[in-house]
Amino acid sequence: MATTTSLLGLSKPAASDAADITVLNTNFDLIDAFLKGTGIGTTAKSIDSLDNATAFGLYNSNVGAPTSSYHACLVLPYNANYIVQIAYHSSTNPTVLCMRRKQHTDGWQPWEYVNPPMAAGVEYRTTERCDGKSVYRKRIVYTTTDIGTADSVSSINIPHGIASFGELVSATAHMGTYALPIMDSNGYMTLVNAVNSANITLRTNGVWGNERTWTIDLKYTKA
């Protein structure tokens, strides 16, 4: 007696049944329709919102996406309550990278960058964690003119504009081709001294004349 599969409803003839090409072709059509409906084996399937993309497959939408542009999104469900989405921008712009989010019992979590493009002044939530908290990244670019006094320690406070700054994970900085800390030929030192809830503090016992542009990359958690 013939039976059917539980997922696609494919017909499974009994060993005693005669071969039937119609049954075989129907099974092929069911498999093809299933793969097409989930974007597997073809182009990503268009959907009204990525918020509704919960079945395994490859989908495409600009609603519920990381940005207003269309994204190809791979959906990996563990079960009905735990789902992971990995989204890629559908354009050829190489600066837009992969993002990821998950849904648990409390709904969809925010999109997180795997490798953020690090445009100046933009805050990025990333997939990195520190002490179980989400790690954010931000690049601050700041220009100064004629700072410091020789043989006297001076401080430069650079506002970072980060709301709810929590714990500093790391801070790296450079000025042109010089990475901080910088020690010049006279032995004068410039370094990132501290990062608090409002400012990045550089300290120097040298003189930086003319216009200088400082670039600071921060990793941090939220309070």
Description of each model-found segment:
Residues 65-67, 75-78, 134, 140-223:
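Extracellular attachment/recognition segments
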Residues 97-107, 205-214:
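Short, compact, well-ordered microdomains
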Residues 11-13, 23-27, 87-90, 98-103, ...:
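Beta-strand-rich, repetitive solenoid scaffolds
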Residues 5, 10, 19, 56-64, ...:
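Surface-exposed, low-helix, low-complexity loop/repeat segments of extracellular attachment proteins
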Residues 26-58, 103-137, 141, 164:
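Glycine-rich, low-complexity segments
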Residues 79, 89-91, 102-104, 129, ...:
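Acidic surface patches and DE-rich sequence motifs
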Residues 1-36:
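Extracellular "spike/adhesin" assembly and maturation modules
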Residues 31-96, 169:
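Glycine-rich, flexible loop motifs
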